[in-house]
Amino acid sequence: MSDQATRPARTPANRRKAAVDDSEALGIRERNLRLILKAASQEFAAKGFQAARTEDIAARVGLPKANVYYYFQNKRNLYARVLETLVEPLLQAAALLRAELPPEQALPAYIQARMRVAREHPHTYKAVLGEMLLGARQLPAPCGERLRQAAQDNLACLRSWMERGLIATADPQHLLLFLWSATQAHTHFGWQASLITGKTRPAEADYRAVAESVSRLVLGALAVDGARGRLRPFPL
């Protein structure tokens, strides 16, 4: 009897069952990847790359350590993936600083987007900040290049506004660094912030309040003569 004769017929019902099985397998894989990355971001944020252990990451998820290696091969690959997950949100925020937009619209939108990244990805954000303090040596090169180009685009936007008299003249590099530091302070300096706020973890309303305060301070400081009446408060 031929092999073809012994195989089950490829009926529509069989094909539907195979498609369901494939979909379920893909769903399990995506779920495991998401859970492992979340657990890894928590471990790396708390302990850094060197001290974080793969078995502790697996324990957070409730999976065998072998499963972590199955999906990511080694801890270094997993760390790189954690860092990569924050790149796209940061780039989306950076894209909001556009020279064709008025600064009173673009700057608050950029500040709010940066604060949203910190709020929605607190552990990953902290892990990335820790890596940057070490020189971003383990950040994948393509990610670093995209972030570098986005920063250059943001500087060009700030220069354009200054040259057209839309905002007061200042060193655009210093201004961009200030925007970065102001929007990541709650994540980077959590303990220091708690001394002022009395909260161990900021709530969503706290992030919104910080975004509004920073926006008003920045717009007020950058207002040029005759422009203060034109700059309107940013509604959050």
Please tell me what each predicted stretch does.
Residues 32, 75, 82, 86, ...:
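Hydrophobic/aromatic residues within well-ordered alpha-helical segments
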Residues 35, 43-77, 81:
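Helix-turn-helix
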